[in-house]
Curated annotation (Swiss-Prot):
Gene: myrf
Coiled coil: 646-677
The enzyme's E.C. designation: 3.4.-.-
Record keywords: Activator, Autocatalytic cleavage, Coiled coil, Cytoplasm, Differentiation, DNA-binding, Endoplasmic reticulum, Glycoprotein, Hydrolase, Membrane, Nucleus, Protease, Transcription, Transcription regulation, Transmembrane, Transmembrane helix
Domain Peptidase S74: 553-662
Subunit structure: Homotrimer.
UniProt name for this protein: Myelin regulatory factor
Residue spans binding DNA: 246-507
Organism: Xenopus laevis
Gene Ontology CC terms: cytoplasm; endoplasmic reticulum membrane; nucleus
Amino acid sequence: MDVEDENETLRRFFEGHDINGALEPSNIDTSILEDYISKEDSSEICFPDIPSSVSYASPQPCGSSGVHLSSVLSNVGHTGSINSGGVHHLGQQMAVRPGPGPTCGGPPYPPHLNCNNNNAMLNPKGYPMCMSNQGLPIKAEPKTSYAAGTLPDSPPDSGSEAYSPQQLSDPHLLRTMTPENICHITPPSRLEHPPPPHLQGPLPPHSIHQQHYPSMQRELYMKVESMMPQYQNLGPAMPPADLHHAQQSQMLHQLLQQQHGAELPVHPSKKRKHSDSPTNTLREQISNGGMVKSEPGLIQDNDSLNGSYLDPNYQSIKWQPHLQNKWVSLYDASYKELPMLTYKVDADKGFNFSTGDDSFVCQKKNHFQVTVYIGMIGEPKYVKTPEGILPIECFFLKLNGVKLEAINQAISIEQSQSDRSKRPFHPVTLSLPPDQVTKVTVGRLHFSETTSNNMRKKGKPNPDQRYFLLVVALQVQAQNQTYLVAAQASERIIVRASNPGQFESDSEVLWQRGQLPDTVFHHGRIGINTERPDEALVVHGNVKIMGSLMHPSDIRAKESVEEVDTTEQLKRISQMRLVHYHYKPEFASTVGLDENAAETGVIAQEVQEILPEAVKESGDLVCANGETIENFLVVNKERIFMENVGAVKELCKLTDNLETRIDELERWSHKLAKLRRLDSMKSTNSHTGSSQFSRAGSVPYKQRPPKVMGKTVPGPAHQSCVSQRFLQATIIALVIIMAFSVISMTTLYVLNLRSEDDMLGIDGSLTPPGSCTLTFFRQIHLTLPYALCTGSSQNFDTTQLKGNTTPPPKITKSPDWQQDPPLTINLCMDPPCEVVCCPHILSSESPTITRKTSAASAETISQTDPAPSTIIRKAKSRNLDKNRNSLQTLPRPVSPLPPYTQGKNKHSPNSLPVRDVRKRRSLEEESTPITPMDRTQGNSNDSRYSLTSLRLLETDALITNRSCSSMDTCGSGNYTYKLPISKYSPLSGSLSLELNSSSPVSVNFCETSKGKGCQEPAAVTSPRDQSCPQGTDVCVTQVSPTSHLWSLQLLPSQDFTFHLRVSPPGASGCDDLSIDPSQVTDYYFRFYRLCD
């Protein structure tokens, strides 16, 4: 019988059946195609292209003319397609019906690969051919001959994708054809030259539309898809994504308008809409039965190719570049070198990681599948080889295995067929469109042999285990030579035999039932929330333990035991810094911690400097955002806890020592208290003890009779005992008497010192008439004693102290003129001057002082002299040492309180209300003048503004700390000077006071206070100077910011005081509340008149 054409056969077949029903394989009559299928499977015949109306009875020889590529490209505009869920577009890879080659001989490169640049067809045996680089990129893959069978596409135990392509010429497909797979069959455009005349026959009625579509014998099935999306970073020459999308949409519209009316009849209900069609899928049948898919939709971006694939948490097997030194460079048509293409390999299935073997394991009987992503930048035309730049004939994908210990030894790869047979895997010819990503998936692969030394030893991996590496290489052919473009090799792989009893399951090896009931044994490391544990148990997150953590501590398991120095542990703990912190969000999400939880702890880098053995490196840590922390440090808090134990022990030792010392101090305190009580009792009985000691000392000493040599004088037996006791009692009595004597002498000495202080001190109290007061007036180099007698005409220079070893110098003066003490202010400008006496009035009432402030407000303050003057009734000679002669006790001033102190406080802010202790100074100390700044300079922390020197211009005398009323009134922001005025000075007048400072200050007059008034003569002028402001007794002339000249008006009173305040520059007055009181210094100048 004549063999019908495929199109005609299919058309007649579907016209005779109801396609609305279920077209099951059992319901299809395939008797019409039996003869055709049986003859087509022969590999020794070739079928030429014939029109659809021509039939032939015998196959044609291989020498028949084949398809010419030029004819296909010249008529590409007449493309026709059916609505099968996909459309053609610009640059789409189109299928070409293979035709016979010039000869049936094998190609020069592999035995089954024909790469001829001038031939656009596949050999009859169905091996891949090389694509011409001229014109539109075209993929053409033939169908390999298979014997008829009834096996399904995939083995039942395989999860791989269907191996057999959905072709019309596939006998198995014809038996299992359904309307669903028919809808996906698109007749590719056949734009060829007319067949030879002897093969032409009558055209069918619709031949006007079918003339370019010859028989579909040996056709390839291709599902058309949308154009692959562009890479994000393919280079500047790549068109933008929006322009590419616009071109794709335009070409889609053109192809839809060019569809021919005469198409295969398909039921409308079985048509798939364009929106329902699967996108991003391109299936091509290769010569050895592998599936080549182009699914760029699975590629997210360029970062996913480079970054996420290197993530250590990636689930699949890892790949690394292989033989990079042998990679060649590609060039475009203008001989410009193209950028390196993007090449990524991914193992979809077939490899499982074995924790016990620490490697990926592949069972030889199971399939493994590999997907390759190739991103081509530009259109390659040439390749640079050691022989020079050669034109590219084709690209192909090659898979093979190599041994890890010898990578030059290749392991062949096999591929399963539909009938479960295995054939060697041959390279896959590829067409790489420019500026696009091509996805190629090859499935049903097996290693041809297994690795060596796979047998386990005692349930553990064999130490002599051998490994394979799977190499996926992209190669290019030029002038019958192959060159490596890119290649990647996998991690080490163990390939095991198919006998499951030969190996134990990984689950059984890792997790086993323990020896005790309800126990499980695991061999290896465990990671919770992490896939790469570096310890026996690694937990990323919090751990909750309701019990206790136990640690080994048996002495029998320890050696080199040494006790630590707790002192060093305390020092290390004191150096550690405790901080509050939050973990970074990217780190917390990686290790399973709460991002907002606040933690308290230490810093590993700081602990590493103090306690290095408590810090350990745990390798690099990759966070969720891709950031890598190199040599991540962890802290052993158990080690720090033991440091705390040692530090606490050291603190306990220190506490015990302190308690011991406190107990000793308490015992000594009790003993001292008892001694004080005994001293007080002895001081009361010191007189009695002295008299007894005197009487005991007056008893005559009884000499013992001399001893006669060689003769013993007998005596009473009890006499020696009595004498021994008497001697002991005498010694004890002498010791007690001596102690009493020392205590009595000390007490008397202290009492005498106090009496002398009262006798020699003058504090400004009233002196009764007829008495003399001994007063010492100091000079810098001389101290002269004077006796001030009230109501007596005796001169000062005639009263001398009796018993002085050095009499005072004699001073000769006129009867009407008497020299005042050296520090007395004498305003007598034209001596001799008249005596102006302002006598002290004896009264029981305290003097009344009227204080004048800068606001002209007056208040009356009642003050009582703190200590009465001492009246010397008898002039008793007394020898005084130099220190005693150099002492001076000046009357205590009645100083007004500063305005910022409390009215009840009678002392300076830094002084205590205690009795002034008489301080001793030597003549050498007195010889050095002390300025008001001597005390403030001693305190470097004092920030007060003060003066450096005070000088009276009338007498050209410096006012120093010797003029202080007491040592406690000069310092800490308060200086009170007591200045005597001679009786020869008038009641009115002025004093010029020069104030100097080391830095600019502001000097303000605060207030004036005066005591009892004197009987002012009528001739005395007004005390106020007309040049001074009204209402004040002072006027100031500022010479410079550091020098001030004040004019003080004398007041007709027994004593009067001027109050000046030194403040920071810019102070408005004494009542300026914006000035800090700790920065001001108050100066009180108290003048009192000498009457007698």
